[in-house]
Design a protein with these regions (language model features):
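Bacterial N-terminal signal peptides that target proteins for export
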Residues: 1-9
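Internal maturation/activation junctions in enzymes
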Residues: 41, 315-422, 436, 443, ...
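Noncatalytic scaffold domains of N-terminal-nucleophile
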Residues: 26-72, 76, 84-245, 249-251, ...
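Active-site rim segments in enzyme catalytic domains, especially the processed small/beta chain
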Residues: 97-123, 268-270, 415-481, 505, ...
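C-terminal motif of bacterial Sec signal peptides marking the signal peptidase cleavage site
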Residues: 17-20
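Short, small/polar residue-rich loop motifs at catalytic or cofactor-binding pockets
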Residues: 281, 401-404, 465-467
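Bacterial signal peptide processing site
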Residues: 22-24
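Extended C-terminal subregions enriched in glycine
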Residues: 461, 495, 504-555
Length: 587
């Protein structure tokens, strides 16, 4: 994928296709969202041709990112002759600054890469591990039977920075330091606070420490909309990463300062835990569905769950049922429960625990599993298909959190990247280190303390991860599309709904993202957008689903992004979900 600079196109020659971002309520407050009136009675076969945003098409390159400033940074890289990996790194650096509660250099990342010249697909696991002190006995001595969802004990080693550097070393073409310049500039000199960002800060900032409150909620309120938000300490840290790479973060002053800060707060990370961290190039998982080959991350992520969901869907005639009919929605919801029961029982770090991926993806097994769906009644509890039920407790301090950013780019040489990075929950652990400006994630909260569970905490172990970027190829092996979304547990659910909108119901990428969605939660709890017809909602209730009908367009249902390539013309169509602040640009 490394490609020398071949093309320089002036920004003045480009008319950016930008659309306003819809404001949305936060998914962390699902239970507090009011019930609203559903859509009027309309034919169940309605195709959602109307859309909030235009289709964004280009013939040379495209980007889609979780914030317009990030998308613009990625576009500039592509137009300056950089490739898709260069663009993703630049966008990641900007998002670490302008969406600080959702991601940053204190969090984790994963990426899938397509080489336009060779057709090679590679996957990078840039998630961090528990420290050497993180034994079950350590937590038992603290009187805990569950790892806290925030605070110092929820912090595992941040992996994002190593991921940026490793991705650049393998595929990047521009100078690494140059790629972080825009993010550093926004951190040092400020960026304008949006309405959505101010709302996020106020609704998610309750667990912030004093340094975090001083920066993001001064005087107990978010910075005024339109004001400039600066984090000069973070700018300094990003500059160290830009000039010193991984060593500057994991072996230098940043690691020493962060480990000291975590120790002061009562956490378990020490300098050697940072120094020992590595990313890993891993073999992605592949599965066929709807005449495409889908590429996902292997465990420790829930990518295996995505492929299982696709495989089980083959046993039901979803197209005949009709998009967003009661039968269609009920089937997908019940299949999700089956897939998640296996996920919660088995998905963990395969370097430290047995994860039976071949059995979880066995076609005969999944065909039989899919037959367990009762079309008349929603299942309240679903057991895993194999393994002791007693060991199938949810992993760690699981919540419906989904405070993540997704990034994707396709360049003029046909290279494509699907990248995701996250703090896990809003503001992560709630711990902002004033000296470095780094907010630490809380991904370590997803370990369990249950004896014998594959995801039981252990030194040097990676926790189970919800992060699940995806890529699809045409049958001839050529790139088809990237797709990803924030949303925690809803990521796999959102991806199958969008995929079927695109491939089964012939929607454009933007239509596929904007169509009404559901989010199955614990038990029979179901968040669903009010653009679903009232007749369908009544039928779902009659089958036992406990509905929370939510007004669109809220962040409860993720914030998906996609870049699709037309196999006949090569035209790229980039899409960005209006439910959050995502932006798509193509040229």
């Amino acid at each position: 994928m490394k490609t020398p600079t071949r093309l320089l196109i002036s920004l003045s020659a480009l008319a950016l296709v930008l659309a306003s971002c819809e404001e949305a309520q936060l998914e962390s407050n699902d239970a507090e969202l009011p019930q609203v009136v559903a859509a009027p009675e309309t034919p169940a076969s309605t195709k959602y041709a109307s859309q909030n945003r235009p289709d964004v098409r280009g013939r040379i390159g495209a980007v889609s990112a979780g914030h317009p400033l990030a998308a613009q940074a990625g576009l500039r890289v592509l137009q300056s002759g950089g490739n898709a990996t260069d663009a993703v790194i630049a966008m990641a650096g900007v998002l670490a600054v302008v969406r600080p509660h959702m991601n940053g250099i204190g969090g984790d990342a994963f990426g899938i890469f397509y080489d336009g010249e060779t057709g090679e697909v590679a996957a990078l696991n840039a998630s961090g591990r528990a420290g050497a002190l993180a034994t079950p006995e350590f937590f038992a001595a603290a009187g805990l039977d569950q790892i806290p969802g925030a605070g110092p004990l929820s912090v595992s080693v941040p992996g994002a920075v190593a991921g940026w550097v490793d991705a650049h070393e393998r595929y990047g073409s521009m100078d690494f330091a140059d790629l972080l310049e825009t993010g550093i500039d926004y951190a040092r000199n400020g960026f304008a606070v949006s309405t959505r960002l101010a709302q996020d800060f106020e609704e998610q900032g309750a667990n912030l420490n004093q340094a975090g409150l001083d920066l993001y909620l001064p005087n107990a309120a978010a910075p005024p909309v339109g004001s400039l938000l600066r984090n000069p300490a973070l700018a300094d840290s990003l500059q160290i990463v830009a000039t010193e790479g991984k060593e500057g973060f994991y072996q230098g002053d940043i690691a020493k300062r962060l480990s000291a800060f975590i120790t002061e707060q009562g956490g378990y990370l020490r300098p050697e835990d940072f120094a020992n961290h590595t990313s890993n190039w891993v073999t992605p998982l592949r599965g066929d569905y709807l005449d495409h080959e889908f590429i996902v991350m292997p465990p420790n992520t829930q990518g295996v769950t995505q492929l299982a969901l696709f495989a089980m869907a083959k046993s039901h005639d979803l197209k005949q049922q009709g998009q967003n009919t009661a039968d269609y929605l009920h089937t997908l919801i019940e299949l999700k429960k089956l897939a998640f029961a296996d996920r919660d029982r088995w998905v963990a770090d395969p370097e430290m625990a047995p994860v039976p991926v071949p059995q979880l993806l066995d076609s005969d097994y999944l065909r039989q599993r899919a037959l367990a769906v009762d079309m008349a009644v929603a299942a309240v509890e679903v057991a895993p298909g194999f393994g002791e039920v007693a060991a199938a407790a949810p992993n760690g301090s699981r919540s419906d959190a989904g405070d993540t950013v997704y990034i994707t780019a396709v360049d003029q040489w046909g290279n494509a990247v699907s990248w995701i990075q996250s703090n896990f929950a809003g503001f992560g652990s709630g711990l902002l280190d004033e000296a470095t400006g780094i907010l630490l994630h809380n991904r370590g909260a997803l370990f369990t303390l249950e004896t014998g569970h594959p995801n039981q905490v252990a030194p040097g172990k990676r926790p189970y991860h919800t992060l699940s970027p995806m890529m699809a190829l045409y049958p001839n092996g050529q790139f088809a599309f990237t797709l990803g979304t924030p949303g925690g547990d809803s990521q796999t659910q959102t991806i199958i709904q969008i995929t079927q909108n695109l491939l089964m119901f012939d929607m454009t990428p933007q239509q596929a993202l904007e169509a009404p969605r559901f989010r199955s939660q614990t038990g029979n709890r179901l968040a669903i957008e009010n653009r679903i017809t009232e007749a369908v909602l009544r039928e779902l209730r009659s089958r036992g689903h406990e509905l929370n009908v939510i007004e669109g367009w809220t962040a409860t249902f993720g914030g998906a992004q996609m870049i699709h390539r037309d196999p006949a013309t090569g035209v790229l169509t980039a899409a960005a979900d209006p439910r959050r602040e995502a932006y798509a640009i193509a040229y």
